């Protein structure tokens, strides 16, 4: 039942993407910074960071429109995306992007203003036919990596939002702040591999269970698919750290 609800939420988020897209825009935050404006995407990114301290990457697993799009694509390519150095690409992108935002803000002039609906039409992102060119371009950028490389490849390799939540969840874990995370009892594991097959991120959950690393995996989106699939209840949600 939990996975049906989760997937329904992702589909709703995906369908609402033409309305919400500018609130996740990595470009508009730079444009707003050049005008000393705190825009909607700035507020969203800061909120993601703060929430991740207590909820990990739950946003990615339950509410992210880009995640919903990629999980639909996984029906065409359900192979796990390769890891290693590729996972670091998004951090390089993030550092360069954040540096650009900061430099742009410092060099800009004028009083600071707050406009959550910056560059939207009464809060709606895509309201004109011409804007759909941008929308479908973004859709292609989200879809192609997952089509070529496998499960949620865009999340793994290129997502500019993921580092906010990785940093936030890491802070929560290091400081032992109560946080939603997945813990495993490896003695219960029978190495059936069902957790690996069910993971929408294509993670090697079985190995993480054997090495007791489920709680510290920064690529885990706390979706709970592995928990629901495990026949021995070896995986569970926890709030308190051991």
Model-found features: residue ranges?
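Non-ligating segments of multi-cofactor redox enzymes
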Residues: 1-209, 213, 218-221, 225-242
């Amino acid at each position: 039942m939990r996975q049906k609800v989760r997937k329904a939420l992702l589909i709703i988020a995906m369908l609402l993407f033409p309305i919400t897209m500018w609130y996740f825009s990595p470009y508009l935050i730079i444009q707003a910074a050049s005008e000393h404006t705190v825009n909607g995407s700035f507020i969203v990114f800061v909120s993601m960071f703060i929430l991740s301290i207590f909820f990990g990457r739950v946003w990615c697993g339950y509410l992210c429109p880009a995640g919903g799009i990629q999980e639909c694509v996984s029906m065409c390519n359900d192979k796990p995306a390769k890891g290693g150095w590729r996972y670091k690409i998004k951090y390089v992108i993030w550092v360069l992007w954040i540096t650009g935002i900061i430099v742009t803000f410092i060099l800009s002039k004028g009083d600071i203003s707050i406009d959550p609906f910056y560059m939207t039409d009464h809060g709606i992102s895509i309201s004109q036919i011409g804007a759909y060119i941008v929308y479908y371009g973004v859709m292609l950028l989200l879809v192609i990596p997952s089509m070529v490389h496998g499960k949620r490849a865009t999340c793994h390799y290129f997502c500019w939002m993921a580092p906010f939540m990785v940093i936030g969840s890491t802070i929560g874990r290091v400081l032992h702040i109560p946080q939603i995370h997945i813990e495993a009892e490896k003695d219960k594991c029978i190495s059936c591999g069902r957790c690996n097959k069910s993971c929408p991120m294509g993670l090697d959950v079985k190995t993480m269970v054997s090495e007791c690393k489920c709680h510290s995996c920064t690529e885990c989106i706390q979706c709970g698919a592995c928990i629901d699939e495990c026949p021995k209840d070896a995986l569970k949600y926890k709030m308190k750290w051991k």
